[in-house]
Design a protein with these regions (language model features):
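Short glycine/proline- and aromatic-enriched beta-strand/turn motifs that initiate or cap beta-hairpins
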Residues: 21-84
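Outer-envelope beta-barrel architecture signal
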Residues: 28-34, 61, 70-74, 103-107, ...
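Transmembrane beta-strands of outer-membrane beta-barrel pores
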Residues: 38-46, 69-73, 78-84, 102, ...
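Outer-membrane beta-barrel transmembrane domain signature
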Residues: 42-44, 173-252, 263-264
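Outer-membrane beta-barrel translocator domains and adjoining extracellular loop/strand segments
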Residues: 44-52, 87-91, 119-124, 151-153, ...
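Outer-membrane pore/translocation modules
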Residues: 93-194, 260
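Outer-membrane beta-barrel "beta-signal"
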Residues: 136-143, 277-289
């Protein structure tokens, strides 16, 4: 208990010290980094008039490896063979992410394929052949980038020395594909592809403590406008993304824990709303070479 109080006291003193100090953002001398991550990923899909309330991935644990050089980063993740239900087929998950950070900007690209979900019926799991495919290309600009660095909290290639925050503005193109091969979600019995354009915005704030400990809180949101290529009808796609990152950013190595929730609504009509909920917990280690 005494150690806990001492730890909180030193964090508070470090926070007050860094607010007053006003130190700039440091760029590590070592430009190349290796990245190792463990991802606990929970994707839930809910569809109107389906045979399930919601379904989820059967393999929620991924491992990842990646790297970074200069302003460019990439990560590859693969699902480990641990299942929620051993009687059902394992989920198939593939995800590739890349990030690029020119001054004050963040460009993000991703491709993800998620096959085979399960849902619960009277404490038993049932397999469903739902497939979700998505690709995203987004850009976000930080209005206050002299003292605030998004990448310092999430990519760990900068060291932010002062508590600061910034408004974020940008946009995104998203291609979302949904298919229920076994017709458990009848509306998606035929594959539906939705190209989506969305303005994006939010706010992010990083609290800096002593010894390069940090805490970042971020809230992003967007209102997307999509087109269902199968029915030629417009789809309203609002999305909210709260994020939290906590970690330590040293000169040769760094680590963080990131919690993120991504909630997407698909408004096909006033009475027809489906949803995709993606919650993840990531532990990232970065070694600068």
């Amino acid at each position: 208990m005494i150690r806990c109080k001492y730890f909180l006291f030193t964090l508070l003193c470090g926070l007050l010290f860094n607010i007053a100090l006003g130190a700039p953002i440091e760029v590590p001398e070592k430009k190349f980094s290796l990245r190792f991550s463990t991802l606990f990923n929970f994707i839930n899909f809910s569809a109107k008039d389906s045979y399930f309330d919601n379904c989820q991935l059967n393999q929620p644990i991924d491992i990842g490896i990646g790297g970074g050089i200069g302003d460019f980063f990439w990560d590859f993740t693969y699902a480990l063979p641990f299942s929620i239900d051993d009687k059902s087929s394992p989920s198939e998950v593939f995800e590739l992410n890349t990030n690029f950070y020119p001054k004050g900007l963040w460009f993000h690209g991703m491709v993800g394929v998620y096959n085979r979900f399960v849902f619960s019926v009277e404490k038993e799991y049932v397999e469903t052949k739902v497939q979700i495919f998505e690709t995203r290309i987004s850009g976000i600009y930080s209005l206050e980038n002299e003292y605030f660095s998004w990448r310092a909290a999430y990519e760990l290639d900068r060291i932010q020395k002062k508590t600061a925050g910034s408004w974020l503005v940008g946009g995104e193109f998203r291609l979302l594909g949904l298919h229920s091969k076994d017709q458990m979600a009848p509306y998606y019995a035929k594959r539906r592809m939705l190209p989506i354009l969305a303005p994006k915005g939010g706010y992010s704030h990083t609290f800096i403590f002593s010894n390069d400990w940090f805490l970042n809180l971020t809230l992003l949101g967007e209102i997307g406008f999509g087109l269902d290529l199968l029915s030629d009808k417009f789809v309203l796609v609002p999305e909210s993304i709260p994020k939290l990152a906590f970690g330590k950013n040293g000169k040769s190595w760094a680590w963080n824990m990131v919690i993120q929730c991504d909630y997407t609504l698909l408004g096909h009509s006033i009475k027809h709303w489906d949803s995709i909920y993606d919650a993840s917990f990531v532990v990232l280690f970065v070694w600068r070479i």
